[in-house]
Amino acid sequence: MDLAAAAEPGAGSQHLEVRDEVAEKCQKLFLDFLEEFQSSDGEIKYLQLAEELIRPERNTLVVSFVDLEQFNQQLSTTIQEEFYRVYPYLCRALKTFVKDRKEIPLAKDFYVAFQDLPTRHKIRELTSSRIGLLTRISGQVVRTHPVHPELVSGTFLCLDCQTVIRDVEQQFKYTQPNICRNPVCANRRRFLLDTNKSRFVDFQKVRIQETQAELPRGSIPRSLEVILRAEAVESAQAGDKCDFTGTLIVVPDVSKLSTPGARAETNSRVSGVDGYETEGIRGLRALGVRDLSYRLVFLACCVAPTNPRFGGKELRDEEQTAESIKNQMTVKEWEKVFEMSQDKNLYHNLCTSLFPTIHGNDEVKRGVLLMLFGGVPKTTGEGTSLRGDINVCIVGDPSTAKSQFLKHVEEFSPRAVYTSGKASSAAGLTAAVVRDEESHEFVIEAGALMLADNGVCCIDEFDKMDVRDQVAIHEAMEQQTISITKAGVKATLNARTSILAAANPISGHYDRSKSLKQNINLSAPIMSRFDLFFILVDECNEVTDYAIARRIVDLHSRIEESIDRVYSLDDIRRYLLFARQFKPKISKESEDFIVEQYKHLRQRDGSGVTKSSWRITVRQLESMIRLSEAMARMHCCDEVQPKHVKEAFRLLNKSIIRVETPDVNLDQEEEIQMEVDEGAGGINGHADSPAPVNGINGYNEDINQESAPKASLRLGFSEYCRISNLIVLHLRKVEEEEDESALKRSELVNWYLKEIESEIDSEEELINKKRIIEKVIHRLTHYDHVLIELTQAGLKGSTEGSESYEEDPYLVVNPNYLLED
């Protein structure tokens, strides 16, 4: 830009004017390109775009480098190789082009931005050989600074002779004139900046980092500072993966000047008796001169999302409409989206296409798919936000493909962050306040949840996180904000992200006899914030093991052939983007159905037959609503239908019920009674009564046999539920058929034995089955309170046979009991 300053007319009549013929030729050719290049329909392509620049807020014209190559190959090559040198002349050509057609303010500057460069470079490929060349790089934005005004061209006033010195180019730091332009004035230091006549431009500094896909083996991600000017400011936010087009420049490292180790030495010399120096000056340090180091910075003129249409920031952009998305697609792409929306088997096909390498685990695939579609975020009249994002946690044994789900989602979703719970701190997950090296101001550096804003944050080893780190994400999981108050910075940041977490059980393997809460090391507040819990158990099943082994071997031997996708990932991304624009409303019918299902969950939570994995709260009701909305979105419906609620309830039901309950001990009451009798210790005199010594009567042997430990009668939980459901259904059927009806216990036992008559082969088995059904009825009556024994006062009429009635009471089903599906 110093050459451009020298080429400015009127830069000083006493100085020799240096003409850059190459740059001036580029200026003329670029002006010809703007005036002559036509689009496919025969119109001048950049005319209308240039006319929009007269608006006060516009000053940058975006030019496709492909168009430039088509127009003049030599011009495009010169611009690419001498970009820093010719850039001011290109901006002047644009100003001339606009001035010829519209009236513009004289002081307004115009800028050119190039996009669609054919090659993209990695951050670690930027060396000093690429300084000044037009380059395109990509990376993820990890830190953004506030927008500041930057002094581009200064106007100075000489304090000695009052001469005005215009257009002093700033070399990326505050630069004063070397000497006053007045020939009779020798001032070199005393100048005053006239801010009213100087030119400023918007300036923002961002830091980008290499993406994981670009990292060589065993390398740490490198970062680079990018300078954005004019319209490019605020076009990239923390977490965005963007392409930056511009040039590599060298700037003085001002931060090194203020470090303690670089202080100048001015008084190190020893003075003699008369005040003279005893030694001469040795080295530059003795003169107080510091070594000025330099660093590489990327000066960007254009910023674009890495995947501009169906990725980056726009996948979760709530402001777009279905019509605007349709306009972004080609006819073929839109036909594919429409075809997918009409697919009767869309739910299954999307799951298999998204996770083709994972065998089984269909429920987890469905839950993760609904998480990607998400619910509808809402704001109440008081301003309270209700989140629409769905949080999913996968708990399971080792080698059950938990991390594979997280990796698949990270690769598929354009804005996803993968992190490990053990290696992450609270600041790394939320946000950190750091001091800027140059301005020494505190700035906020985005953590994983901020980087995944409007995306998915995948957290592996979630149970290994420290408790204080888990507490830090409470707010982000429910309110979807991150509040920071530290180091004089008070801010509330957005973290509108879905969390997909994977956790291992406490003992390494899931204990089926314990509830979910007892199996994982998570607090109750964290657990209630997850919409879905999926439990993966590594079972020894011959059929399943063969299928999994067959799948893995196929993947290793025939990678391309074994991956069978109905839809490509790009098709799914386009369909996701389109479907997420729907804002389904809940119909009256669905509303009643949701309330009814929630009542079922609450009542079952308090019943004794089945215990839930954790407490059912209002958050589970909101989870059901979000899942129902995600189902409606997936089918591109404007209204939530009862079938959507039914599927949401089924998924929620899978995660709320524990995997397996321990066997039911039917002799529990007798064992407790025996313990009580043993503890009595002969108070009633039974233990002290003498027994026959010789055992002539035979009682002593029987007593010894009975006192031997007896195996308790146990029944599998599933079998216990099956028998109880049979009993309940039969009793209700009898109640419906007859008005005044109730079965006696003996009648119920006889009915059950008759039902299973074909399963009984011997008298001993009959006695055993009869004992089991009697114990089950006793437990259902006195422990689970599913059945009720009618008292004598509750029956109409008869007062006879009260003794027999107490031994063989009438049984009815508790009216509050809900039969399990």
Curated annotation (Swiss-Prot):
Q: Top-level EC class, please? A: hydrolase
Q: What is the effect of changing G239S?
A: Found in a patient with endocrine disorders, developmental regression, autism spectrum disorder and epilepsy; uncertain significance
CDD domains (alphabetical): MCM6 (cd17757)
The reactions it catalyses are: ATP + H2O = ADP + phosphate + H(+)
Binding-site positions, ATP: H359, S399, T400, A401, K402, S403, N504
Which keywords appear in this protein's UniProt record, sorted alphabetically? Answer: Acetylation, ATP-binding, Cell cycle, Chromosome, DNA replication, DNA-binding, Glycoprotein, Helicase, Hydrolase, Nucleotide-binding, Nucleus, Phosphoprotein
Q: Which residues bind ADP?
A: R619, E622
What cellular component GO annotations does this protein have? chromosome, telomeric region; CMG complex; cytosol; MCM complex; nucleoplasm; nucleus
What's the Enzyme Commission number for this chain?
A: 3.6.4.12
Question: What are the annotated disulfide bridges?
Answer: none
> Known consequence of changing D202G?
Found in a patient with intra-uterine growth restriction, developmental delay and autism spectrum disorder; uncertain significance
Instruction: Give residues where Phosphoserine occurs.
Output: S13, S219, S271, S689, S762
Query: Do you know which Gene3D superfamilies this protein is assigned to?
Result: 1.20.58.870, 2.20.28.10, mini-chromosome maintenance (MCM) complex, chain A, domain 1, Nucleic acid-binding proteins, P-loop containing nucleotide triphosphate hydrolases
Any idea which GO molecular function terms this record carries? ATP binding; ATP hydrolysis activity; DNA helicase activity; identical protein binding; single-stranded DNA binding
Q: Which residues does the record list as N-acetylmethionine (modified residue)?
A: M1
Cell location: Nucleus; Chromosome
Q: Which residues carry this modification: Phosphothreonine?
A: T278, T791
Q: One biological-process term from Gene Ontology?
A: DNA replication
On subunit structure and binding partners, the annotation says:
Component of the MCM2-7 complex. The complex forms a toroidal hexameric ring with the proposed subunit order MCM2-MCM6-MCM4-MCM7-MCM3-MCM5. Component of the CMG helicase complex, a hexameric ring of related MCM2-7 subunits stabilized by CDC45 and the tetrameric GINS complex. May interact with MCM10. Interacts with TIPIN. Interacts with CDT1. Interacts with MCMBP. Interacts with DDI2.
* Record's function text: Acts as a component of the MCM2-7 complex (MCM complex) which is the replicative helicase essential for 'once per cell cycle' DNA replication initiation and elongation in eukaryotic cells. Core component of CDC45-MCM-GINS (CMG) helicase, the molecular machine that unwinds template DNA during replication, and around which the replisome is built.
Protein name as it appears in the record: DNA replication licensing factor MCM6
Q: What is the lineage of its organism?
A: Eukaryota, Metazoa, Chordata, Craniata, Vertebrata
The gene behind this protein is MCM6
